[in-house]
């Protein structure tokens, strides 16, 4: 996403290209699968970015999006100020409920909430995040862009199987940890 990083990557492969913030530099239906891992919370137009991910994947191909869940309502030891504290967790819960109602009543008005980046030293993870990503909206925008959502999980890395099942078995997965969503573009 940044010019200097693309230049570094070009030393290894010529397949890296700069994303201009609007259009991914690939043709329609180019890839069998695409993924955005910890990217969505940093782009200026996340709704359009999801549409672009779907555009460049072939029909039947998979889209994987993993981002922090900034609307956590459950959890301890959260790393970002938006996730920390009982007051924020209550506000996050209320905001998610409002968003769910909005998705049903007025889908065209749904947008990810934006955040101001945090400027502090030392830099902390996701201080530069500008989008309050969450599973509900990632799932919603994938479905709006002609995808079937296959999985929504709160774990974005390997955990012991019994713990993984317990964390991702029920609806609480939408209000914990991360937003890990796998979808398939409809044929």
Language-model-detected regions and their locations in the chain:
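Helix-loop segment at the mouth of the active site in Rossmann-fold oxidoreductases
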Residues: 24-26, 43
């Amino acid at each position: 996403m940044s010019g200097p990083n693309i230049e570094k990557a070009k030393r290894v492969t010529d397949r890296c290209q700069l994303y201009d913030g609007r259009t991914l530099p690939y043709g329609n239906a180019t890839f069998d699968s695409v993924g955005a891992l910890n990217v969505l919370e940093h782009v200026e137009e996340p709704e359009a970015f999801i549409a672009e991910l779907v555009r460049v994947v072939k029909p039947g191909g998979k889209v994987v999006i993993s981002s922090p869940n900034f609307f956590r309502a459950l959890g301890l030891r959260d790393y970002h100020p938006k996730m920390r504290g009982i007051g924020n967790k209550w506000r996050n819960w209320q905001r998610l409920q409002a968003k769910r109602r909005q998705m049903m009543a007025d889908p065209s008005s749904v947008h990810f909430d934006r955040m101001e980046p945090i400027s502090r030293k030392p830099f902390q993870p996701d201080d530069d995040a500008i989008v309050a990503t969450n599973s509900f909206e990632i799932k919603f925008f994938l479905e709006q862009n002609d995808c079937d959502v296959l999985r929504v999980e709160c774990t974005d890395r390997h955990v012991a199987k019994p713990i993984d099942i317990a964390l991702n078995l029920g609806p609480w997965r939408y209000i914990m940890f991360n937003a890990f969503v796998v979808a398939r573009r409809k044929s």
